[in-house]
Each structure stands twice: as structure tokens, then as C-alpha cells.
Amino acid sequence: MKEKVIIVGGGISGLTAGIYAQRSGFDVLILEKCSTPGGVSTCWKRKGYMFEGGVHWLNGSGSHLDLHKVWLEVGALQENNPIYFKDPVYVLKNGKADLAIWRDAERTLKELSAYSPRDRKALRSIFRDVKMFRYFQSPVEGETRILDYVRMLPAILITPRLWMQSIGYYLSRIKDPDVRTLLEAVVAPVNNAMTFAYTLSGFFTGDSGYPSGGSLRMALNMAHTFVKAGGQIRYNTTVEKVVDGGVFVEGELLKADAVIVTVDARTAIDKLFEKPLQDGWARRMRKLLATSQTVFVGVGVEADLNSYPKSMVFKVPFRDGGVDLSFFVVSNYARDRYSPEGCTTVTALFPGYSYGWWKAAKEDGTYEEKKQAVAQKFIGILEEQIPETRGRIAVVDVATPLTYQRYCDTYEGSYMSDWMPFTLTTNAPNRYRKGLYFAGQRTAYSGGLPPAVISGRLTARLLCKDFKHKFTNK
């Protein structure tokens, strides 16, 4: 008789663990709180406009990477969602000449240096660091070879230096404010500089594309792959407690030989078990975890913005919604069939530690009013920067950290962890003990989808080892 495995959460890590465990001979049930799979990697619709709430680029898009094999194994990438590699990657709209990051590193360096000759030396130094990461990739257990680590050695050797600097400090040597703003748009400046070099290198080396259909299409593909393998998913199901031998749902014990917790581990350690976990790693997580939070604004525009870049950096201050920013990034989905014919979906993220601000607004009754104020401020800026949108806004939607928390139970409404300078990641263990496992972004380094899928795969391997099953990846 097959061992029963219950997975708490149907996000990317939960789906991944479920697919591999089901293929490897377990009887797997995924319990998902929401009505759709994917967790924080999701899209949603308002009045015919689809808003991308998860993927903005996908590490593992490049077919030369081990991570790409994993995305294929779990069925995330199929014929129904081919990868699109936007080029330019980012364009700074500053009222003068547009400034761009292209997928060609030499072209980008040449244009930035021509725009700001006084920064030529600093730019060459930064781009040398970025070049060191051209062979760097997320290691995948059982796939990444010794030769791969040898090729990654140049990046590994400079990582300590970059890890000790924030992106903001690392880029402070750039004197021209436009060039500096464009580069800071790649990754939030509070993170360590290694994340900047790695991310920018991905754009320059044929990675970090966008899957057609976005987050939801990927998640639906994975859910279909899981069910096709024989697994079961129960949506709209909240797990109340994880106990020895199973989980409680609506007061009923669902028995299992093993439980894999893939919801936010920071939330789980305090709320999901009979008593809060007090292991050393759990105490460190409570003390040190730095969360990535954002305010999301999406609008539907009754205008075709196909002539505008896919990702635009607006060098315009935004001080509202608990954030104080000197610039922000706007995503243009005119070419992605995310809206009615002749119309366009436009979204923007406003990162910052705004959870407390929004929580206070909820408590004092001004939450909806402040969401509306954020929406109107964004619309005003959008109409100024892109005149075609003026008076053409058909729908607007705002998601705050409280929104993410309500739907996904993420700690402080965060969508991943920040990786700050001088700090190690505060990770939950993939294997807590035989029969109880963790997977998800809080079990690995920061970075969105890659640690989610890699940790789900690793946890399935550990499960197989404990129960003496052969790990099957196809």
C-alpha cells in the first residue's frame, strides 16, 4: 500500500514536491487555501484585464540551464506558454533620451558610457563583476555537475565582496543619477550586490525570459501535471494544524504518513503546529528574517500601448502607501493578450516595508480610502508619462501586503525574503524529521521562483530517502 503524503499549500514548491513524490510511488494530496494553484505566483482578472502578480522574469528560461530541465520536468513550461525574451529589458523614461538595459551586455555598457562618460570606469568595473556570473546558476541536486561548479568559480570568488555591500552602496559610485536609477531598477537596492550581478548576468546570457500566460499558466500546467500523475488537489481548504500523523481540516484529522509544509515557514512556525516551534533555526528566523513587501497597482487602459517598452522605469517620486521611492517600474502588457482588443494592462510595484502602515489603516478604518489614494496617485503619474492613458482608465486594482497575507498567509504579506548585506539567509530545514518536511522560499536563499521549485524537488528527494523509494523525476 502506498504511503500517504499530505502537502500543505499548492504554490510552486507544493506542486513541485507533489509531482515528484507522486511519480516516486507515494499517494499525494495537496491542500490549497485558494481556488487556484500557484500561491503568490499568480494572476487575476478584473473586467477582462489580467494582472500579473508573480513572474516578471523567470530564472531557468534559458535551455542551457539545469533549472530549465526542472521547469520542464514539472510541466511548468510547455507548448502553451513559450518564453518571450523582452529586449530591451528596462527603459528609463526621463523626458530626455531614453536609457536602456539591453540583452547585449556590450551594447548596454557602450550606451551607458556614452550617456555618462564620467562613469565609464565605474561602469566597466561593475560590468566585469556581472560578467563573472555568466556561468553561475542555481544548483540542482542530481543535475549540477562538478564541471558546472568549476565554471562558477569566478563568481564564487567575488561573492563575499559583493555579499558585504548593499546594491545601493555598490552602485553609489555611479555619478549620473539616470544611469544609477536604471541599474537600481534591476533588484531592490536593499539587497546585497551579489543578487544584482547574478540577476543582470541572467539578462545578458539568454536567461530570465517571460513565459506566455504568466504565473497562472505555469501553475495550471503544474497542477495538470500533478493530477495527470495520479495526485489529488483540494482547493478552498485551510489546514488548521499539523500534528503527528496528519493534519486537521475543519476539526477533522486527515491521516498521513508524511506531511510537507510549503506555506510560509515564518507563519507556520508560530501558527501551524500545536505549539510554536522553538528550534534554533526557528528562533533565528523570528529574529533575523527580512521580508520583501510591495504594493501592487494594476490598471486597464482603453488604449493600445504597443509602441511603448515592456518595462519602463519612471524616475518620479512616489510617497504614499507606506513607501517613499525616488523611482518605480511599470510593466506594459500590450502584446500579451491580457486585455480586450485594442486595450492594455499596465501594472506597477511599489516595494518597501509597508505592512505596518497598511495594518494601521485597516485598524483605523481608512484602508479602502488609502488604497484609492494610491491608485489615483499612480494614475496621475501614468497619465503624465503616457498621455494616451489620460481619461482612458477602465479598471484599477490595488493589492497591499495585507492582500497577500489574506490570500496566502505570508508573513507580513511578503512575497519573498530580502537578502541583506552581511547576513546569511534564515532558512527552515527541508527535513525536520522523518515524516515532517518543509519546502518553499523560506527554506533557501532569496529569489522568488527558483528556490521554490528547487526546494520542492529537494524535499521530495529527502522524502524518498526516508521511505526508501527511488526518486523519479519523469
Residue ranges with predicted function:
Residues 9, 235-237, 243:
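Short loop/edge segments at beta-strand edges and connector loops
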Residues 55, 441-463, 467:
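A conserved FAD-binding loop/helix module that cradles the flavin
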Residues 240-341:
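Mid-domain catalytic core of redox enzymes
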Residues 131-229, 236, 407-420:
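Active-site/ligand-binding neighborhood in enzyme catalytic cores
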Residues 26-28, 259, 391:
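Hydrophobic anchor at the start of a short beta-strand
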Residues 2-132:
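N-terminal glycine-rich phosphate/pyrophosphate-binding loop and immediately adjacent elements
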Residues 177-190, 387-446:
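A glycine-rich dinucleotide-binding beta-alpha-beta segment and adjacent secondary-structure elements
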Residues 302-402:
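C-terminal segments that line or cap access tunnels to active or ligand-binding sites in enzymes
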